């Protein structure tokens, strides 16, 4: 097979490696043959993102060519009534074919005209084409904040026709009207011409990962579905108001919730309406939105560039970007937007028959649970109650009766929950993992006074949380009081809402956070929340660098999908076998390395571990990364070695760096470590699950060795894990399983969390084809075939099956780097 043919390499911008072609083959096959779910593991550094882009976009362009706009003919009539008989049914076939051919020709011609239009725009800086609305010609004056800014609209009753709810509904109608007007506002870009028959949704965890995706997409191009003329990739990144808002005052707010509420409030007030918001029945505004849409398609843009485009054109990028949703071939969006049905609905985002690609999917189970889970501690409740009382006392005379009554009910409700926690503490009921009995919480309370549904509706419709939070923040600024790291009132609001609508797949339970008591609502069964995505989409592709072990996805994410509709593919590493050495260390002399909970602090083992690290430091050039199972254990190690002098001995061989739990110091530590590693050498002690193990890539001299200390099992005594394992056992038994099976499934889940963390941490080390590294796994349990079966495939294939002495391990390390030195010569 000639892999130089771009059609056989999926239009990859470079000559792909064999493993990249294999991955692209697997993805294309999954989409083409309508598998419902695809699981793809491609080790970090193997060009996974480009492989995903090239295979999926090649399929889409091929699909568009075969469709040949054939749906256009059927869309032109009888769309709303499929049972209606058309006059054309009586016409001869040649007449129908001629009619459809005429429509295809016309729509194809318009699409080609639009491509030419985009080509012209791509040559012209958008900043020079700003259209100023008449009302925007004056210079904006900064308005001083006064107490009126902190007052909510009058809130009269739940049925008032002039209520905030009515205003919100009217506002949504206006937004929809704007988008519909724009869809037909320019003859060059009628919506039905450019609507993509299938949309690719790419979702990832972080903003930076989505930006990286946009940059990778920008270096690709694909065969046109329009014939001779080049066809641009129609890409649209979506994000929150917090990322896209260009209003100076609103965008400076501290949280996503505050920005959302402030945005809605500005749209409701005629005298303070956001000047960047698209307007109804305003041709100039329609023109701006259309211009924004065209420029965003002319050149691929990430979120920052989309924000800049909106600022230059003086139109809200959050709302204007909706114009391109139907016409996009690829949409990039964060997990929260994709995985929450209500969010997709509010954006007008349909994933029906689409291709959904979820990157970094190794943490998908946790992500789905976390975005549907909330918690509150007793101390947080106390702080919120104090804030509510402060606000109420300040503004009580200026609030109408509706606001006063509902605020008092909110204060009473928060006080009720706080008192319940205090009483349970006294009675020793707050055992981590044990159920919180919500019925007990409201026992003896006045139902009318504490109608949670009405309070929840008031919080949702009045946006009072934003008003109170901004007032409290300003009060703290004026008094130089330190602000909380996250707006607590929004957190309490989310918790109270969970009391109203708890999912049957979730559970309320107790937990302990330091010396504070927490009530947590946790989604225990993410499969039902994910079902809507799986059943709506054409196919869902879960991709990641470290997907092993995969059993949990089958069991807890899509148990309702038949096995024959799931495709699993694991590709090898881009790095040749001779560039990887995976070694297990069970013992040194007579000391066995066992980092299980009850043995990890054995003094003789810690001493032998320090000596082992010194031996490895003498044989490994440049940088070494050591992963400990937790910050607490790392601190214990360092403290012990400081006292016995072993840390000083290690520091004579490599400059020592420690990961801090304070994320603000990460960049400076990495910078200094990198300089030392490339120089005389350095060793970085890091933590599994910390910043270094998740988001940082260690290539070349930064990680000539990666050392894993023990198996990083999560805290078995955390309330969350106890509740989850209990749920797994109950579910197994409810399906007819035995007690032994229930315990086994619970143990497997616990073990799989640990092994995914191992794979994720080790996977940060080797980044490209010429990279090389030694991986050393310290713990006798790594010699178990059961544990080894859960390692990433590329590690399993490199691990030595036989147990060896530590001296032999050192010899292998020395030989490995000696061979690399000879190769360089």
UniProtKB/Swiss-Prot annotation:
* Location within or outside the cell: Nucleus
- The primary location reported for this protein is nucleus
Motif DEAH box boundaries: 359-362
By its UniProt entry, which Pfam families does this protein fall under?
DEAD_2, Helicase_C_2
Q: Describe how the cofactor binds.
A: Binds 1 [4Fe-4S] cluster.
Stretches for region Disordered: 67-100, 121-166
Cofactor(s) needed by this chain = [4Fe-4S] cluster
What processes does the entry annotate via GO biological process terms?
establishment of sister chromatid cohesion; interstrand cross-link repair; mitotic G1 DNA damage checkpoint signaling; mitotic sister chromatid cohesion
Binding site residues for ATP: 42-49
EC numbers listed for it are 5.6.2.3
Q: Residue ranges under compositional bias (Acidic residues)?
A: 147-157
Q: Where does [4Fe-4S] cluster bind?
A: 245, 263, 274, 316
What Gene3D superfamilies does this protein's entry cite?
Answer: P-loop containing nucleotide triphosphate hydrolases (3.40.50.300)
Enzyme class, top EC level, equals: isomerase
Q: Which residue windows does the record flag with biased composition (Polar residues)?
A: 69-86
Presence of the UniProt keyword Transport in the record:
no
Name the UniProt record assigns to this protein: ATP-dependent DNA helicase CHL1
The root-end lineage is:
Eukaryota, Fungi, Dikarya, Ascomycota, Saccharomycotina
Q: Which gene encodes it?
A: CHL1
């Amino acid at each position: 097979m000639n892999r130089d043919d771009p059609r056989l390499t999926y239009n990859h911008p470079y000559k792909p490696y064999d493993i990249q072609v294999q991955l692209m083959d697997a993805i294309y096959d999954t989409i083409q043959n309508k598998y419902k779910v695809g699981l793809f593991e491609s080790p970090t550094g193997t060009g996974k993102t480009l492989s995903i882009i090239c295979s999926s976009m090649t399929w889409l362009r091929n699909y568009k060519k075969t469709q040949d706009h054939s749906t256009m003919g059927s869309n032109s009539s009888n769309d709303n009534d499929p049972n209606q008989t058309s006059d054309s049914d009586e016409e001869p076939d040649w007449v129908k074919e001629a009619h459809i051919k005429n429509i295809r020709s016309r729509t194809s011609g318009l699409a080609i005209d639009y491509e030419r239009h985009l080509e012209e725009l791509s040559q012209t800086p958008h900043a020079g084409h700003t259209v100023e609305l008449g009302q925007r010609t004056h210079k904006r004056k900064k308005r001083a904040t006064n107490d009126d800014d902190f007052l909510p609209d009058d809130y009269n009753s739940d049925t008032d026709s002039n209520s905030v709810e009515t205003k919100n509904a009217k506002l949504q109608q206006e937004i929809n009207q704007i988008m519909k007007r724009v869809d037909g506002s320019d003859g060059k870009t009628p919506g039905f011409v450019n609507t993509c028959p299938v949309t690719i949704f790419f979702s990832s965890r972080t903003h930076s990962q989505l930006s990286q995706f946009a940059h990778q997409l920008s270096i690709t191009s694909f065969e046109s579905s329009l014939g001779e003329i080049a066809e641009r990739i129609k890409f649209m990144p979506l994000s929150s108001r917090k990322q896209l808002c260009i209003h100076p005052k609103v965008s400076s707010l501290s949280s996503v919730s505050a920005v959302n509420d402030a945005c809605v409030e500005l749209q409701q007030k005629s005298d303070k309406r956001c000047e960047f918001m698209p307007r109804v029945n305003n041709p100039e505004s329609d023109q701006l939105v259309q211009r924004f849409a065209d420029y965003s398609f002319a050149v691929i843009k990430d979120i920052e560039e989309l924000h800049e485009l909106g600022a230059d054109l003086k139109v809200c990028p959050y709302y204007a970007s909706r114009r391109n949703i139907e016409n996009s071939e690829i949409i990039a969006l964060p997990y929260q937007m994709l995985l929450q049905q209500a969010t997709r609905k509010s954006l007008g985002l349909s994933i029906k028959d689409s291709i959904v690609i979820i990157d970094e999917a190794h943490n998908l189970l946790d992500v789905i649970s976390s975005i549907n889970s909330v918690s509150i501690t007793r101390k947080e409740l106390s702080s919120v109650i104090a804030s509510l009382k402060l606000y109420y006392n300040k503004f009580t005379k200026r609030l109408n009766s509706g606001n006063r009554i509902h605020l008092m009910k909110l204060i009473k409700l928060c006080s009720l929950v706080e008192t319940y926690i205090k009483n349970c503490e006294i009675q020793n009921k707050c055992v981590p993992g044990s159920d919180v009995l919500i019925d007990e919480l409201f026992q003896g309370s006045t139902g009318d006074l504490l109608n949670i549904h009405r309070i929840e509706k008031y919080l949702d419709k009045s946006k009072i949380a934003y008003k109170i939070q901004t007032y409290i923040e300003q009060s703290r600024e004026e008094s130089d009081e330190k602000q909380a790291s996250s707006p607590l009132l929004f957190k309490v609001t989310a918790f109270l809402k969970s009391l109203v609508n708890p999912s049957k797949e979730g559970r309320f339970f107790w937990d302990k956070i330091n010396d504070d008591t927490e009530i947590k609502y946790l989604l225990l069964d993410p499969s039902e929340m994910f079902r809507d995505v799986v059943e709506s989409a054409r196919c869902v592709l879960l991709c990641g660098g470290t997907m092993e072990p995969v059993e949990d996805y089958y069991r807890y994410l899509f148990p309702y999908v038949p096995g024959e509709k799931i495709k699993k593919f694991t590709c090898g590493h881009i790095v040749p076998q001779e560039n990887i050495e995976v070694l297990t260390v069970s013992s040194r002399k007579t000391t066995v390395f066992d980092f299980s909970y009850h043995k990890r602090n054995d003094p003789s083992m810690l001493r032998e571990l320090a000596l082992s690290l010194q031996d490895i430091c003498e044989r490994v050039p440049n940088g070494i990364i050591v992963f400990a199972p937790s910050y607490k254990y790392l601190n214990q190690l360092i403290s012990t070695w400081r006292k016995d002098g072993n840390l000083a001995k290690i520091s004579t061989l490599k400059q020592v760096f420690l990961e801090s739990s304070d994320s603000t110091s990460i960049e400076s530590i990495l910078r200094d470590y990198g300089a030392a590693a490339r120089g005389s050498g350095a060793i970085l002690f890091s933590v599994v699950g910390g910043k270094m193990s998740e988001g940082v890539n260690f290539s070349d001299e930064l990680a000539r060795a990666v050392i894993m200390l023990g198996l990083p099992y999560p805290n078995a005594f955390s309330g969350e894990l106890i509740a989850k394992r209990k749920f797994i056992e109950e579910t197994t038994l409810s399906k007819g399983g035995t007690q032994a099976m229930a315990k086994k499934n619970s143990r497997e889940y616990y073990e799989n969390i640990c092994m995914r963390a191992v794979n994720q941490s080790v996977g940060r080390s080797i980044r490209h084809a010429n990279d090389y590294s030694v991986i050393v796994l310290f713990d006798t349990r790594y010699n178990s075939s059961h544990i080894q079966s859960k390692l990433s495939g590329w590690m399993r294939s490199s691990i030595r099956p036989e147990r060896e002495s530590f001296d032999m391990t050192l010899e292998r390390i020395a030989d490995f780097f000696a061979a690399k030195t000879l190769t360089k010569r």
